[in-house]
Amino acid sequence: MASVAAVLILQLALFPVPLGVWVQGLILGLLGSLMAVGLGLTYRLNKVVNFSQGDLGTAPAVLAVGLIGFSSVNYFLGLATGLVAAVLLTAAVEILVVRRFRRSPRLILTVVTIGLSQFLVVIALLIPRIWGQTPISTAVVNFPWHFTWHIAPVVFNSNDLVAVIVSIGCLVAVSLWFTKTDIGIAVQAAGDRRDRASMLGIPVGRLQSVTWVVAGVLSFVTIFFQAAILGLPLDPTFGLTALVTALAALALGNFTELPVIAASAVVLGVLQQGVAWNDPADPALALAVLAAVVFGAIVVRQLLASRRDREVEATLSLAGSVRDLPAAARDLTEVKVAKPTGAAVAFAAACTLPLWMGQGELIRASALVALAVVGCSIVVLTGWSGQVSLGQMSFAAVGGVMGAVALIDWHWDLSLAFLLAGATAAVVAVVVGLPTLRLDGMFAAVTTLAFALAASGYLLVPAEFSWIPQGQLGTPYLFGASITSQASTFELSLGVLVLVLAALQGLRHSRIGRVLRALPANQRAASGYGVRIVWAKLTAFAISGFIAGLAGVLLLLATQSYQETSYLASASLVVFTATAVGGLSSSLGAVLGAAVVEGSVVYLPPSWQLFPAALGVIIVLILFPRGLAGLCYDLRDWAVGALARRHGAAPVSPAVAS
């Protein structure tokens, strides 16, 4: 409980509040503890962070709130309907989606939960249309029997008391279920030794269903009773913000210690209220404070971690990354001609786009190319080295800010702006990755997501810091040549993408590339061959950050000014899932994912824009675990195999993990 005491001391020392505000934070923290405990339960069993935890209860809560607020349904009937909906929805998600990946690498299941999160956000955004309402925050949900009391300076009512009673009741019930019942004890055993539990006849699949349903119900209870106190502001970042608070509690509780996780969530609620009370004009500051708490907790875990905790399990690697063709196949004349010819045709076709696209379409095309570059950075960090990053757009934002400083304030040449942006983003990426270097690559997902929310909400917002330029770019120059049109901006973006792809191709075949790709599969074996694991991970973060920084400058050029809305945390998740759809282990996957997912988003209304990435990542990973690029490589191997047979050569093996 030392971490809980540390957060409480931080709040009392830096963000003191009156008693009433402190009690209000305690109430909200109790509700938040339910979501954090649900997150801890699924992590305990599956050893993955369930990024859909914040959204599992959102859609049922929106349904219940709509029934009560718009259809005048009885409060208890609406609550019961939402509760049943939460059970059915979570059970369906676990049986139809999660269970299909029970034997998949943990990285794949993590990507699936991100896709589920986005899919559930779309559902929650569409439910209010049943009543012709948008947004749902106009609905009012109050406990039927109303009374108030006052603890200066806050007036509490029956909704607050009900929230306290329900929260404590749920925590006690989960504690008794987890420690006293046969199912709860079996969940503990399966979480500690899943394979051994299966061998002993424990129905792990059924336990997983029960655990996920419990987590979904806890998520629903959190959001429904918060709606009565704070309302239900529904947007794509709503679940993310709640999730980061739960992640902070999870980190403070060492990811598996449920009592500490619950207590941490309570004191984090008090801390958030303290930050909001001391700086009411700047609510986004709470995100930065939460990010700092996450970083501190991960650093402490790294210092205290045992050797076993520090070893990355092989299941974090991808199932079957891309392998080059055998030398005999590469020597075939058709293969020698096809590869450069195909690349040249694709590049030439892309270069013709400015001839038939309008200005608005060219802006979108330039942004799409920039996002493909961000996808390439994800390939290096996640696809190759196994460090899950959910904050790549925040590194791109660093590049965008430094590019704006170089171009607007200092009037530098674009070449120097690219170098400054890439170098700065590389340094920031290394700093963000430092707390997780000796831990499982899954922990990088927590720190990068926390940084993404803090950066997009506070750290890199011009309204918060006056040194961030807000003006228009004007006419940038590259080696003295002016970039005066959207067509030239697109051509520059395309050129940068080609250079990045060529650099990654060379890097992949270098010693550094081979070392990075060996990290997820067997860290101990790599260390035995003289690989310095920490330095290899630092290299991955630096290279990835540099590439993302370049993409930030490209986005800056496309929009002609630094706009923090281009680098939101939700955009980081969309880019990550787009790359997963394309194929995390291949730079081709980054391009395909950006083209298919990001390209389709352009033509959809706002409430549907998360749908392609959400549905795409689930369907593609079920049918093609290596993404669209993996499908392309399978077709390549089939075609080359047919050619080899015609020439009487040995058949080509399918692309497998290297």
What are these regions (language model features)?
Residues 21-32, 36, 54:
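N-terminal transmembrane alpha-helices
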Residues 32-41, 61, 83-95, 371-377, ...:
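Central hydrophobic cores of alpha-helical transmembrane segments in multi-pass inner-membrane proteins
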Residues 38-46, 91-100, 249-253, 377-381, ...:
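C-terminal ends of transmembrane helices
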Residues 40-49, 220-237, 251, 549-564:
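Non-cytoplasmic
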Residues 48-51, 169, 193:
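Glycine-rich phosphate-binding loops of nucleotide-dependent enzymes
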Residues 177-185, 189-193, 507-513, 519:
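Transmembrane helix boundary and interhelical loop/hinge segments in multi-pass membrane proteins
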